[in-house]
Amino acid sequence: TLCSESSPLMSTHSWRDALKIYSSPASIALLLLGFAAGLPYMLVFSTLSVWLRESGVDLKTIAFASLIGLTYAFKWVWSPLLDQWRLPILGRLGRRRSWLVLSQSLVAIGLAGMALCDPQESLSVLISLAVLVAFASATQDVAVDAYRLEIAENESQAALAATYMAGYRIAALFAIAGALYFADWFGA
């Protein structure tokens, strides 16, 4: 039967084993990397559209800007390059870490630049920065997946994927709720 002791569906791990896996340094790192990947995703997809609408940008332009999200759908196109190219300066950190550092740096620069833009005055700059953020974030997503596969044994992969997704979802909530909070705070 499905619930017999010999069933492959029955777990042989205790709560202590689960706690050990989910509190490991690798799990905590993946939780933080998930947060770092989820935040720009939601900012580019949801929050940007709301911001543009609140700024009076026409709906056709907002619809066009939503195409930025396609970078996440097509990340498979450039993902093999992350395996092939070794970054010149950051390469000493290792292949995965160097791509993580580069992509996170580009995300931070892009988000900071977006925060300084006024959609009414510099819409093209804002959209260009959003494309940069989306591309760097999608690249970061690829690098994190490869990093996760390299740092852990097979039996830990499910826990690491779960902590990554938990961080991703927490970031999504933070991006949406945080945007609403700051909009209220600044009276936008």
Model region roles, listed by residue range:
Residues H13-Y72:
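Helix-loop boundary and gating motifs at the non-cytosolic
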Residues F35, G110-G113, E121-Q140:
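Hydrophobic core of transmembrane alpha-helices in multi-pass small-molecule transporters
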Residues K75, A159-A179:
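Glycine-rich segments within core transmembrane alpha-helices of 12-TM secondary carriers
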Residues D83-Q84, A115, F174-A188:
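Transmembrane alpha-helix termini and helix-breaking/packing motifs in multi-pass membrane transporters
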Residues Q84-Q104:
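Cytoplasmic membrane-interface "Motif A"-like loop-to-helix N-cap segments
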Residues T139-A152:
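Intracellular juxtamembrane helix-capping segments at the cytosolic ends
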